[in-house]
Amino acid sequence: MNRCLVRNPMRTRSWLNGSLQACLGTNSPTAACRQKHSLQAPVARPSDVEYCRLLVQKNDYDNYLVSLFSPKHTREAVWGIRAMNVELVRAGETTTNDMAARMRYSYWRDTVNSLYTSSPVQTPISRVVHDAVQRFGISRTWLRRLVSERQNALEQKTFATSADVESYGERAYACLVHPHLEALGVRDMHADNAARAIGVAMAVMAFIRSLPLLLAQGRCDLPRDLVAKHKVDLEDLFDHPRLTPELQDAVYDFATKGYTRLCGVAEIYLPSSPSTALPALLAAVPVQEWLERLERANFDPFDKILQRRSLRVLWRLWAASRRGTWLQKSNYH
């Protein structure tokens, strides 16, 4: 049976109205924390910036493309923080045991603390991020949370509910959008809420995208409530990773949650945000494009089309930057 992602604007608005009060809380670090910009001389070398740029281009290509639509003076900050995220992801994926991963996360916590001193840890990434902190007043909260949430996810192993994944996305993945907003000089409640919702969609995409690899390793990142709801037989999938009708239903359900958030951002938060926030919020475009490819693959995460880079992302980023939104009339039916 062919399925379509939910694009009904009334359903999107209903979800947003229902959760608006929670999203507009006063506990936003961006609203509460204001860093004073330092006049310290930059410590990063041109080779440090190039190292970060190449690391992001190789390991996070879609978001590298997003960075190219940001004002030139902000790109180094974006590359530095994205490069830091690449290393944090590697810390969880490449270490052979949890203790080794904890040691690497401890190193990154110390590194983050050093970024707010005059003597940052001397690595290319830390020097570039240090300069971003000093130049743009990047909140310490986002960088600390980036480290802590990656470690928490490693130790938690699985998520009990879809709501847990959404909360994780708001905390972990949105921490990559918030600093970009700060580098753009945007301190705005609506833009912050947009970043949270984009973070949810990013987490949904990442969890679905990793399914083929994780199932082959005897793991599954789908929240347990969806697995139970759709009666997914994980033991069978661990032995023979493949698409089953039950897995397809669960993936469809999960993907729709992420896609609804993106439509909600474009419909509600983006029009209320400063126009200067758009370069950071364009992080939604690659996620939307991937989820729509998943839809064309009939929600089969094993489809090879999902593992390849899409040439459409660059064009859609350009179009969204020109129109001021990533929604098209065809997004609703």
Name the predicted role of every residue range.
Residues N2-W15, C23, P29-A132, S139-R150, ...:
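Catalytic cores of Mg2+-dependent Asp-rich isoprenoid enzymes
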Residues Q151-A183:
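Internal, conserved structured core segments that host functional sites
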Residues A183-N193:
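A contiguous catalytic/ligand-binding core that recognizes phosphate-bearing ligands
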Residues A206-F207:
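Conserved phosphate/anionic-ligand binding catalytic regions in large, soluble enzymes, centered on
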